């Protein structure tokens, strides 16, 4: 039957964007179309994922057709994939709309004529088998993927010919069409164009034709053809060759898979015409149709005029035809003209009417759980949690003391303040542990982070590893499509932090929204983030949101879960008072003795994907979420009371969504908290809906995890889901604790069929007789009910083994400790599981892991080989990681290395390698070359029978395929080099030659050799000797007269070419001289005169190919240097002249193209070139890598090389490496990542309650934690520095004018802590006798302005030891130890004996000194004078002053003092040993150093260590006068001195201090250590005491030595300056010190390779650190310094370089403003460039209205060696005081600029308000006679004269309304101090401007040029601008944004230039717009400098 309907599909060259936009708009009204658009994109995504990385990059990441349009418009679609797919989708979209409007259109009974050209045949094929819209959607979705494959194949075939930008086609109109064949033939002959590169006519009609060809050929054709230059030519959007019968046809089987849709039958009335046969395609199914269509697309040319003419014969005459134009097409005119000429009337059908279609089902609606991780009470993992469940463990215990002291709050009546009625809970073991370095968080910030946030980060990482998810590893793991859903219901940590004050990281650490935000930030995910608080339902709600987001396609992978950590008593008290909690212990779920719930802690995270994606991605599916529902108990009598009907409704809803019946549910994981009302209501609702008696074959099993682990509140939902999910894997239902013995009396159980298991029950599909499904309930106290249906995972398919025998196993970590531990864990796992699949192990550790900088890798063919490799690595020291990608060199092998089957293993098992080889074979066949594949693919191939052409082609094809393979795996070269013929493959790898051209030239070259050279007459002789041997040979005329050098391989290796007989004689001659040589088994003498006969033929062949510009460096082995211009002459010389490999390698090393880190990869069949490379360089074996090796399996070589690349820091594309074998591989579960953790826990303290608790002692206040085990004792104490009694002690002790905590306080804390443990805290127990040993003071403690400073004292003792180890640290920085010592139980008997012996030595010294004083030979000081002399360093209050009188030897080396111990001034003081007494009894030694008036006041002696202190505290009394004898000595040859003090009570030594070490240092160094700005100069002279004897000797002599550290430990562990050197510390040491201060890191953790970002240094911290460095050293660094030099090693190198120059000191001079001395200065921040430049004038940018230099931190580099300064407001830190006039403020900016550059010429500028200040500064400079080269004003209108009376007074609300605060709000949370400060400064600036009256510049005094830069977009919409307050906005927003002068011309004159930039006022200052802004400023500076 003839047709009267025509479908016109056009071709793929039509513009798709208008078509796509139309159907996207229409899809809002068509569910069929909406579903098709998503389904088509899904299929294309899957196909794109199969492309090579380079091909994928051209399409980019996409989730919709709109995203594909972006690829098209951004011009990244260089392969035409997006173009072809979009046109297809648009045409099918139009057909869907027409078919919805006319349902009979697709009916099998409707005759249809279908016409399409080229790619238009593909949508026509889909229509051929679709009988309705539903079928069309299904088939077309599949065909969208086929389109993608076709586009990729077109591109691949074309790129093998030419990889060059440009179009592959143009059209010609007019009479010239008939002459085209003649024109093309003439052009080809004239240009010697080889056949494969020729232009050809693909589509022709009588009036126009389309010519296709390589872009460079078409360009040359159009340039050289006079006829074409005069014709109407249109360049077409063609991305490759189609209709190209002269090219090798692709394997069409690769384009069509085994989809069942291919079996669909072609409709009987459907006629699809072939454009080459001009008849309907034959066949009965889509499978038959597609290969014919492919042939028409790829090979056959077509004539549309003839096609349309023939089409008319299939149409019904005499009836109006309906012509459906399915998307725009240029063929419409031609078709209509043809039809009209044949006498048809045509009705054109274009825009189909819209009908609302019925909704289609969108996918399965199921979501897979593919990974999980968690921590639970008593369990650090999910597996450990499961074991607890199986063992019936019930884990409640008393609240640990490290949370809070439960006894302080326990009150069973519940009436007390914050009282708790129960002290029980279920707790995690170590909630404070966190690997801060792993997540780039400084210790300081980590302490502020909620422990739930920290542990969730750990859990997410573990869950991702469990799931095998790495960013961008698959379509579903696109980082832009991963969302995070976290449930959190607690603010405990924020409440805990409040008494300690607000730190700058408290916001992001404790505000709950930062948990998902931090996860996305760290893992670089762009999906949505949600933090959910629905009380106990928080994590269930989070999982529910994640489920819905996946089903709704809002994301493709979701992370869901949350945490519950108990840190304060507040909620314990609230829940106690509310009657929720059990007073007797754990949750007694379903039990008769249930009395409330027991609070619990938990962390849980799951990873989710849509089920279809999980299956496609080869994931391990733990469970499937079939449906989810949530409702609210609206009708309950109380908000917290459960409601049975509401629960029943949520069950019905979730079953309906899942399509299940109640009997399908075999298990319910109940909410089951153990509250009577809750359990009863839940059981009743479950029985009513799911478990009525008589309606079930088997009882419904129920259980609840809370009976074991407590109610983890916000985390309870995720805990229940994880337990339920793992039951599918384990195949067991665990027993319920306390059942059946204590089962409660629930009435509903009598009428229900319910089983609560008391023992484990098998839970398999077989055990229950059907597929397992279960329900998980989660209810919350606020009335919400959540319910999930979980289903068992699909049964895994049995997989064939991986054909690769060798594999790579990798291990990586963020730090060395974690790496070693990960290796140990993996080794143990492999020893325990030796039977696992090596392939699965390799796949899991490579393709399914996130990889870090610290790496190890192992290759092998067995698990044992991997274990042996790990053992070898663990037995030796680790090497530092490679922080940066090393340079990669591809070295291509030359001839002679081939062998049969050289790529056989790869050819057999790697589809990608095989496809490249077969494709190259087809190309060669099209040129008439013989087949060569068997030389690569078959080991048994008779290689000796192969021709030279076959061997050369096989070698180059192998190398091209290997190069492509390595690139696909992520290994791309930075440099290529090829030996001899290998250079052709190198030129391909560099982009100089296309694959087709390379194969063509190599084939023609070999053919010419065969045709023109005689085999066997000539040969090649390889010679190996010393360099002297080679030199002698080359100078020997007997040798060189008959041959020539073919290859110079190394100083001792050459190859000679010549006639065979001559070479035999030379061989004999050399062997007689004991020189190694051998004749090579080659038939010709390459690179010799034998090649003369092929020169012209080769030149002619090469002239027809395109030589591109190298994309990577090419080292020519012809020229021996890097070369960039290649042509036919080069290839001729390359064939004829010698290979200069030696010089080429030498050039690489001498010109820095390679270094010791470079990786050399040989691309070829054997590692021949590597030997030559190593003989020319010192390349180590681990850097010389090969692809293949004769005798080794291909995969052995490749896996070993990949392992080396991985260890060297290369980013391997592991998914690509395993792609061909995905169906053979499975993800396996491996040991968890070994985090390198530190404890960041802080015990809760409550200010008011602390004052009520009696401190342990005056110096040691509270016990935080105590742990006693059989082997050891450990305790943690704290002391509040701000406590009045302790603060009084500290304030009485000043060091050089600065209050510093005395060492005696540290000793007292240590003694008290030890005493507490020994006496169990009893104040009545007798004092133990204790010694203090090895006291070290590393960091001073200085009280801060606030009173929240807390010291933490840690004490440990082994039960077998009598020694306690004590460390003292500021609790805010627990990693920085201030002091440490050992406290030892004293052996009284030994001590008595020792002090008697001591007395015998000391008494004669005392007597001698006393006699000297009596004879006037020693100094006698009374107490007051003693302390006046000591005031040189120490300033004591009276409580410390115990010395009554002192006798000091004349040389100040020994002294004797009488000491009266100070009496206590407060009855509340309590001690073990008073710090006042310790100091009074021992500071005599310090006096001998620092009280000596003859010592220079520039130096001081500081105590740093005390070896031993023995004081019998119980014997001391304030009523006794003691004698103290002291002497000092110098350590030999050092700045270290030692002091000793002995304390006597009559004839009894009651104590002594031995080995007190002091370091001599400059006083200025001490001031820097203590943070003192200026040293205190003593203006009062202390009178020299007169004596009857000789004058006091000179000060102690110093004798430098290198035995001791050069810096005292108090200097924060930073290596500083020696005392005899300059006072100035090194810049690097100050930087490290500031890093430690800001981040809280320990110095030992800072390694040279540490990245600043990894330890939490952000832009704000960076500015703070650099400001401190400037303050201490006077050196000013770029604000971007820590970004420019991102590691410590980088920074150290640059700082050392800078220290070779003069540093720039900040200006100290004052400035006069209005006659008054200015007390403020502007901070001038160096943003870019050197601090001084002799060649370039600096640029000064004045800060905007917010006052901060941070506005300019995103600026790109504005010029080479150009100093760029930002001038900050003087009021940036206290904007409230910014009340001066505009003129006064400008004068301050002027002074700051002149302090840096006293005289001009100047370059000034500023953004926003900074531009106005810059104007005024420029005016003032010009008035002073200075020259201003340029004034740069960024987006601010000229401050024109306005009627100020009209201007409203600025307020915060008004400036917010006009948009001035939006920039701050974009970057800062409004709650931060910084945000408020910046906003206040903005208001102060506007207020200042409101009073200004700008003065125009004087005539003749203008900048050389003024540049004004405008943002094109308004901050606010136009409508909003119209409503702004009158007047004020006029200064900032022009009345009409004309992007011109806008008032500036009235002030600066007419010499102005204007620029404009996309973006608004604020966005232009950040990426990406700031890049363009930087370019404009660079251009402006370039014009004036």
Curated annotation (Swiss-Prot):
Gene name of the record: ntnG
Region feature Thioesterase (TE) domain, mapped onto this chain: 1719-1913
One of the Pfam families matching this protein, by short name: ketoacyl-synt
UniProt-annotated stretches for the region Disordered: 1578-1622
Residue span(s) of domain Carrier: 1622-1699
Pathway assigned to this chain's UniProt record: Secondary metabolite biosynthesis; terpenoid biosynthesis
UniProt modified residues of type O-(pantetheine 4'-phosphoryl)serine: 1659
InterPro entries (alphabetical): AB_hydrolase_fold (IPR029058), Ac_transferase_dom_sf (IPR001227), ACP-like_sf (IPR036736), Acyl_transferase_dom (IPR014043), Acyl_Trfase/lysoPLipase (IPR016035), Ketoacyl_synth_C (IPR014031), Ketoacyl_synth_N (IPR014030), Malonyl_transacylase_ACP-bd (IPR016036)
Region feature Product template (PT) domain, mapped onto this chain: 1265-1566
Domain notes: Multidomain protein; including a starter unit:ACP transacylase (SAT) that selects the starter unit; a ketosynthase (KS) that catalyzes repeated decarboxylative condensation to elongate the polyketide backbone; a malonyl-CoA:ACP transacylase (MAT) that selects and transfers the extender unit malonyl-CoA; a product template (PT) domain that controls the immediate cyclization regioselectivity of the reactive polyketide backbone; and an acyl-carrier protein (ACP) that serves as the tether of the growing and completed polyketide via its phosphopantetheinyl arm.
SUPFAM superfamilies hit by this protein: ACP-like (SSF47336), alpha/beta-Hydrolases (SSF53474), FabD/lysophospholipase-like (SSF52151), Probable ACP-binding domain of malonyl-CoA ACP transacylase (SSF55048), Thiolase-like (SSF53901)
Superkingdom in the source lineage: Eukaryota
Name assigned to this protein: Non-reducing polyketide synthase ntnG
Region described as N-terminal hotdog fold: 1261-1392
Region (C-terminal hotdog fold): 1414-1567
Enzyme Commission no: 2.3.1.-
Residue ranges constituting the Ketosynthase family 3 (KS3) domain according to the UniProt record: 364-792
Keyword Hydrolase set for record: no
Residues covered by the PKS/mFAS DH domain: 1261-1567
Region of interest called Malonyl-CoA:ACP transacylase (MAT) domain, as start-end residue ranges on this chain: 889-1148
Location of region: N-terminal acylcarrier protein transacylase (SAT) domain: 7-243
Single Gene Ontology MF annotation: fatty acid synthase activity
Active site: 536 (for beta-ketoacyl synthase activity), 671 (for beta-ketoacyl synthase activity), 711 (for beta-ketoacyl synthase activity), 980 (for acyl/malonyl transferase activity), 1293 (proton acceptor), 1479 (proton donor)
């Amino acid at each position: 039957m003839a047709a009267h309907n025509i479908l016109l599909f056009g071709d793929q060259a039509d513009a798709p964007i208008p078509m796509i936009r139309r159907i996207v708009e229409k899809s809002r009204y068509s569910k069929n179309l909406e579903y098709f658009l998503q389904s088509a994109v899904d299929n294309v995504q899957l196909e794109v994922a199969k492309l090579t990385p380079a091909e994928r990059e051209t399409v980019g990441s996409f989730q919709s057709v709109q995203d594909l349009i972006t690829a098209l418009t951004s011009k990244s679609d260089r392969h035409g994939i997006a173009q072809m797919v979009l046109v297809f989708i648009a045409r099918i979209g139009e057909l869907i709309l027409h078919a919805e409007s006319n349902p009979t259109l697709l009916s099998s009974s409707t005759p249809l004529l279908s016409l399409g050209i080229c790619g238009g045949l593909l949508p026509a094929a889909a229509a051929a088998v679709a009988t309705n819209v539903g079928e069309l959607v299904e088939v077309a979705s599949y065909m969208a993927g086929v389109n993608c494959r076709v586009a990729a194949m077109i591109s691949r075939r074309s790129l093998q010919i030419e990889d060059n930008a440009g179009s592959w086609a143009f059209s010609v109109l007019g009479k010239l069409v008939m002459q085209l064949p003649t024109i093309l033939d003439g052009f080809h002959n004239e240009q010697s164009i080889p056949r494969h590169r020729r232009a050809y006519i693909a589509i022709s009609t009588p009036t126009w034709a389309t010519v296709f060809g390589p872009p460079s050929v078409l360009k040359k054709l159009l340039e050289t053809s006079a006829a074409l230059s005069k014709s109407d030519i249109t360049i077409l959007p063609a991305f490759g060759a189609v209709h190209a019968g002269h090219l090798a046809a692709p394997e069409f089987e690769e384009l069509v898979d085994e989809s069942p849709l291919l079996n669909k039958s072609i409709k009987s009335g459907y006629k699809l015409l072939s454009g080459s046969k001009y008849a309907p395609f034959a066949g009965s199914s889509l499978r038959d149709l597609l290969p014919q269509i492919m042939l028409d697309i790829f090979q056959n040319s077509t004539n549309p005029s003839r096609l349309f003419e023939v089409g008319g014969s299939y149409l019904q005459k005499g009836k109006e035809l309906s012509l459906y134009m399915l998307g725009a097409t240029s063929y419409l005119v031609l078709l209509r003209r043809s039809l009209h000429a044949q006498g048809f009337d045509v009705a054109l059908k274009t825009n189909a009417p819209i009908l609302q279609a019925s909704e289609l089902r969108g996918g399965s609606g199921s979501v897979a759980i593919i990974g999980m991780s968690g921590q639970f009470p008593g369990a650090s993992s999910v597996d450990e949690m499961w074991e607890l469940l199986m063992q019936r463990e019930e884990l409640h215990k008393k609240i640990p003391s490290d949370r809070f002291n439960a006894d302080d709050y326990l009150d069973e009546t519940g009436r007390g303040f914050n009282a708790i009625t129960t002290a029980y809970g279920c707790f995690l073991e170590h909630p404070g542990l966190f690997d801060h370095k792993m997540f780039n968080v400084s210790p300081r910030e980590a302490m502020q982070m909620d422990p739930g946030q920290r542990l969730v980060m750990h859990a997410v990482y573990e869950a991702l590893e469990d799931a095998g998810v790495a960013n961008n590893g698959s379509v579903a793991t696109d980082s832009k499509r991963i969302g995070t859903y976290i449930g959190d219901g607690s603010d405990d940590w924020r409440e805990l932090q409040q008494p300690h004050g607000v730190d700058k990281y408290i916001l992001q650490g404790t505000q709950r929204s930062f948990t998902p935000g931090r996860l996305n930030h760290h893992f670089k995910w762009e999906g949505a983030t949600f933090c959910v608080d629905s009380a106990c339902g928080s994590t269930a709600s989070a999982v529910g949101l994640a489920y819905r987001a996946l089903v709704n396609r809002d994301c493709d992978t979701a992370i869901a879960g949350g945490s519950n950590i108990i840190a304060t008593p507040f909620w314990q008290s609230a829940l106690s008072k509310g009657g929720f909690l059990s007073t007797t212990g754990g949750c007694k779920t379903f039990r008769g003795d249930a009395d409330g719930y027991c609070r619990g802690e938990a962390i849980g995270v799951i990873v989710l994907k849509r089920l279809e994606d999980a299956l496609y991605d080869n994931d391990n599916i733990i469970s499937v979420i079939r449906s989810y529902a949530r409702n609210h108990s609206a009708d309950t009598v109380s908000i917290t009371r459960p409601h049975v009907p509401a629960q029943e409704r949520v069950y019905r809803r979730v079953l309906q969504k899942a399509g299940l019946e109640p009997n399908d549910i075999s298990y319910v994981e109940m909410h089951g908290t153990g509250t009577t009302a809750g359990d009863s209501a839940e059981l009743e609702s479950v029985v009513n809906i799911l478990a009525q008696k008589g309606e079930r074959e088997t009882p419904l099993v129920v259980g609840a995890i809370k009976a074991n682990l407590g109610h983890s509140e916000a985390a309870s939902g995720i805990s229940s889901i994880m337990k339920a999910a793992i039951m599918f894997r384990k195949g067991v239902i665990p027993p319920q604790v306390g059942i059946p013995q204590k089962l409660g009396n629930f009435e509903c159980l009598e009428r229900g069929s319910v089983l609560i298991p008391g023992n484990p029950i098998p839970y398999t599909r077989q055990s229950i007789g059907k597929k397992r499904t279960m329900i998980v309930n989660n209810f919350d106290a606020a009335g919400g009910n959540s319910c999930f249906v979980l289903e068992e995972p699909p049964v895994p398919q049995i997989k064939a083994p991986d054909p690769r025998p060798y594999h790579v196993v990798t291990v990586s970590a963020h730090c060395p400790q974690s790496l070693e531990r990960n290796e140990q864990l993996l080794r143990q796992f492999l020893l325990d599981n030796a039977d696992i699949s090596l392939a699965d192990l390799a796949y899991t550790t490579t393709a399914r892991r996130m990889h870090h900088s610290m790496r190890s890798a192992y290759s092998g063919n067995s698990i044992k080989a991997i274990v042996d490799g790990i053992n070898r690595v663990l037995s030796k020291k680790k090497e530092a990681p490679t922080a940066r990608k090393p340079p990669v060199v591809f070295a291509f092998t030359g001839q002679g290395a081939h062998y049969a089957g050289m790529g056989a293993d790869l050819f057999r098992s790697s589809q990608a390698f095989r496809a490249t080889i077969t494709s190259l074979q087809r190309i060669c066949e099209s040129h008439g070359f013989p087949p060569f594949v068997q030389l690569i693919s078959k080991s048994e191939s008779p290689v000796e029978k192969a021709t030279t052409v076959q061997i050369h082609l096989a070698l180059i094809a192998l190398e091209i395929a290997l190069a492509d393979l390595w690139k696909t795996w992520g290994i791309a070269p930075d440099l290529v080099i090829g030996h001899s013929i290998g250079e052709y493959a190198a030129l391909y790898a560099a982009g100089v030659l296309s694959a087709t051209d390379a194969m063509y030239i190599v084939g023609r070259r070999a053919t010419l050799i065969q045709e023109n050279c005689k085999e066997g007459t000539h040969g090649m002789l390889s010679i190996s000797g010393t360099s002297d041997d080679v030199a002698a040979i080359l100078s020997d005329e007997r040798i060189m007269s008959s041959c020539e050098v073919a290859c110079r391989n190394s100083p001792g290796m050459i190859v000679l070419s010549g006639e065979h007989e001559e070479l035999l004689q030379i061989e004999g001659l050399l062997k007689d001289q004991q020189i190694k040589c051998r004749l090579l088994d080659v038939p010709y003498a390459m690179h010799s005169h034998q090649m003369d006969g092929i020169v012209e033929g080769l030149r002619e062949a090469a002239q027809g190919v395109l030589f591109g510009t190298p994309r990577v460096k090419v080292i020519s082995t012809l020229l021996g240097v890097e070369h960039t211009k290649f042509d036919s002459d080069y290839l001729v010389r390359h064939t004829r002249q010698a290979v200069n490999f030696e010089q080429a390698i030498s050039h690489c090393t001498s010109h820095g193209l390679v270094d010791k880190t470079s990786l050399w990869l040989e691309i070829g069949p054997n590692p021949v070139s590597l030997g030559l490379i190593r003989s020319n360089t010192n390349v180590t074996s681990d850097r010389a890598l090969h692809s293949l090796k004769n005798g080794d399996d291909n995969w052995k070589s490749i896996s070993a090389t990949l392992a080396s690349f991985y260890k060297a820091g290369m980013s391997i594309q592991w998914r690509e490496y395993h792609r061909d074998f995905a169906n053979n591989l499975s993800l396996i579960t491996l040991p968890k990542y070994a985090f390198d953790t530190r404890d960041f826990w802080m015990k809760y303290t409550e200010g008011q309650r602390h004052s009520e608790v009696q401190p342990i002692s005056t110096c040691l206040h509270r016990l935080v934690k105590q742990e006693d085990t059989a082997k050891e004792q450990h305790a943690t104490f704290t002391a509040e520095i701000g406590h009045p009694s302790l603060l009084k002690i500290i304030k009485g002790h000043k060091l050089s004018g600065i209050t510093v905590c005395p060492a005696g306080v540290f000793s007292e804390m240590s003694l008290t802590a030890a005493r507490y443990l020994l006496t169990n805290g009893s104040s009545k127990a007798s004092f133990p006798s204790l010694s203090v040993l090895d006291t070290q003071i590393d960091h001073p403690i200085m009280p801060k302005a606030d009173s929240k400073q807390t010291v933490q004292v840690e004490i440990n003792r082994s039960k077998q030891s009598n020694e306690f180890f004590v460390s003292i640290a500021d609790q805010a920085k627990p990693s920085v130890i201030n002091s440490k010592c050992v406290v030892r139980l004293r052996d009284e008997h030994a001590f008595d004996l020792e002090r008697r012996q001591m007395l015998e030595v000391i008494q004669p010294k005392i007597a001698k000194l006393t006699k000297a004083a009596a004879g006037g030979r020693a100094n006698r000081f009374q107490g007051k004078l003693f302390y006046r002399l000591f005031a040189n360093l120490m300033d004591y209050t009276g409580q410390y002053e115990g010395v009554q009188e002192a006798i000091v030897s004349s040389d100040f080396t020994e002294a004797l003092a009488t000491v009266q111990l100070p009496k206590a001034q407060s009855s509340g003081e309590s001690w073990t040993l008073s710090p006042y007494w310790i100091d009074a009894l021992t500071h005599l030694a310090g006096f001998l150093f620092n009280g000596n008036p003859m010592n220079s006041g520039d130096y001081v002696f500081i105590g740093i260590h005390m070896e031993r202190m023995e004081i019998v505290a119980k014997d001391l009394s304030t009523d006794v006068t003691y004698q103290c004898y002291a002497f000092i000595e110098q350590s030999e040859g050092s700045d270290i001195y030692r002091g000793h003090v002995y304390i006597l009570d009559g004839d009894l030594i009651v104590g002594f201090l031995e080995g007190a070490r002091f370091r001599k240092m400059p006083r200025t160094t001490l001031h820097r250590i203590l943070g003192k700005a200026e040293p205190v100069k003593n203006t009062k002279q202390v009178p020299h005491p007169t004596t009857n004897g000789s004058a006091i000797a000179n000060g102690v002599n110093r004798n430098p030595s290198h035995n001791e550290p050069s810096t005292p430990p108090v200097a924060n562990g930073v290596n500083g300056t020696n005392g005899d050197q300059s006072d100035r510390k090194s810049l690097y040491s100050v930087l490290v010190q500031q890093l430690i201060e800001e981040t809280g890191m320990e110095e030992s953790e800072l390694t040279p390779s540490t990245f600043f970002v990894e330890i939490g240094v952000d832009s704000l911290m960076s500015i703070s650190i650099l400001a401190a460095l400037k303050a201490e050293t006077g050196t000013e660094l770029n604000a971007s310094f820590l970004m420019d030099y991102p590691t410590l090693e980088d920074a150290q190198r640059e700082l050392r370089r800078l220290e070779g120059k003069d540093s720039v000191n900040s200006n100290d001079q004052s400035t006069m403003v209005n006659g008054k001395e200015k007390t403020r200065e502007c901070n001038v921040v160096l943003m870019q460039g050197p601090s001084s430049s002799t060649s370039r004038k600096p640029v000064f940018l004045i800060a905007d209205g917010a006052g901060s230099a941070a506005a300019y931190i995103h600026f790109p580099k504005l010029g080479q060696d150009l100093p760029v300064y930002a001038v900050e407001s003087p009021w940036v830190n206290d904007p409230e005081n910014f009340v001066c006039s505009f003129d006064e403020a400008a004068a301050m900016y002027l002074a700051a600029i002149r302090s840096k550059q006293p005289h001009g010429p100047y370059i000034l500028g500023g953004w926003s308000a900074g531009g106005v200040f810059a104007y005024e500064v420029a005016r003032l400079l010009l008035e002073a006679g200075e020259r201003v080269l340029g004034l740069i004003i960024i987006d601010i209108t000229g401050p024109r004269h306005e009627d100020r009376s009209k201007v409203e007074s600025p307020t915060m609300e008004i400036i917010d309304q006009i948009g001035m605060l939006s920039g701050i709000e974009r970057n800062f949370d409004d709650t931060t101090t910084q945000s408020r400060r910046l906003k206040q400064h903005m208001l102060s600036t506007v207020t200042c401007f409101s009073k200004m009256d700008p003065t125009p510049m004087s005539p003749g005094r203008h900048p050389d040029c003024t540049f004004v830069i405008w943002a094109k977009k308004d901050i606010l919409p136009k409508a909003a601008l119209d409503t702004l307050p009158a007047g004020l906005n006029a200064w900032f927003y022009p009345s009409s944004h004309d992007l011109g002068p806008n008032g500036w011309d009235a002030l600066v004159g007419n010499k102005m230039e204007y620029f404009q930039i996309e973006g608004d006022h604020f966005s232009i200052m950040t990426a990406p717009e700031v890049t363009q802004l930087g370019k404009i400023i660079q251009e402006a500076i370039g014009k004036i400098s």
